[in-house]
Curated annotation (Swiss-Prot):
Record has Nucleus as a keyword: no
Reactions the enzyme catalyzes: tRNA(Pro) + L-proline + ATP = L-prolyl-tRNA(Pro) + AMP + diphosphate
InterPro entries: aa-tRNA-synt_IIb, aa-tRNA-synth_II, aa-tRNA-synth_II/BPL/LPL, Anticodon-bd, Anticodon-bd_dom_sf, Pro-tRNA-ligase_IIa, Pro-tRNA-ligase_IIa_arc-type, Pro-tRNA_ligase_II_C
Record GO cellular component, one term: cytoplasm
A Pfam family this chain is assigned to: ProRS-C_1
Entry protein name: Proline--tRNA ligase
EC identifiers of the protein: 6.1.1.15
Highest taxon above the source species: Archaea
Amino acid sequence: MTDQELGITESKEHNPGEWYAEVVQKAGLADYAPMGGFIVTRPRGYALWERLQDHLDGWFKETGVQNTYFPMFIPESYLEREKDIVDGFDPEVAWVTHGGHDELEERLAVRPTSESIITPFIAEWVRSYRDLPLRVNQWCSVVRWEATETKPFFRTKEFLWQEGHTAHATEESAWDETMTRLEQYERLYEEVMAIPGMTGRKPEHDKFPGADTTTTIEALMPDGKSVQAGTSHYLGTSFAEAFDIEYTDEDETKQTAHTTSWGLSWRALGALIMTHSDDQGLVIPPALAPTQVVVVPIWQADTEEAVKEYAADLAAELDEQFRVELDDRDERNPGFKFNEHELQGVPLRIEIGPNEVEDEAATLVHRPDGESDVAERESITDAVDEALETVYAKLYASAEATLEENIRKAHGRGEILGTLGQHGGYVKTGWCGDEACEAEIKDEIAAEIVMLPLDEDEPPVYDTCGVCGDEATETAYFAKSY
């Protein structure tokens, strides 16, 4: 890549769509596939997904979840056993009708989600209350044939995700499960991705098909749009009834199980890129960065040996605790290396020149803002640890400020539309519960109710609906969304 090719030419502030696409490609995260709606995930992009997966998978296993894998094809008859699934996903289902030249006796759906193939097996595995709770998860891809413009990680017909499925003896146990997973998603965004999230629940008309309650974590992007960052569904007994998940309780009485499902996709990577990156390229929080620290030696002919040796020793020491790269390439000058590692989002750069060697020191440069510090060589590990914590804190503080500055109240159709149109972000208003009131706003400005408060008993922010003026029963958060 040449110096000209290396730079980001689009502006995040003025042209966020083109800027985002340029960062994704030039930072080596993904390319566009020859088929519309699909992308090729490059090694650096997949490494981000693996880091995210490692965190989440570890937490799942700590709370009793076991990984499994189910076929990507689902018989049509299985989908039809849960009517809400059919109605909810039918327009987006990709169908396999032939095997080679032979027409199949029954169409096979390429999984849009896996409740319909996993739940029948849970029914086989559960016989007694002793088998509950049962918790399984799979990391896989799903296909939803949406007629939307391709936006890597945000909107693709095929995407990677995890989907968890559980069965429980009681509503209380299943609801606790639903909240546990939502809290883990929130933890992932806040502690690992440095993105504050807002948790809530979806309105009745926007729940997962067949769910009793859909909870969500929403993340606000710098362009004022909301991202549905992860969802956790309490499914009640609807799926258990459709697929005969019954168990014998302690009194030898047949009971119907309560089930949950929960999922997070690589849309999280889209949120990560959009939130933190800048006009120099990708910015990644240290916990997710494939390379956390890059050591760049800077030498002249008469100092090359000493500088390289010093830098290599320092990198080797740091590599025991951090993910470190030593960039001692001869064919690239320091300026090119700095720009390249900034483009790729390495959180911390360490510069080693003759002065650092002489002073037994190192210059540490933070990726988010270019702030630099000089650390003593003997305490370099502690200095790097502190610097990475500072980088995380800077990223979180910036994202938190964006969120706090973009939650507003509005009442009345004109004020809601005006606030959304001028500022974007979230607009809180009273809502009567009628989908038609949401439709008025959605038709006018393409904003929708992205969430309601988790606590159904929380008093509405206004006594009357912000759209129709009838009595309000909820606080609704309107936003434009990805």
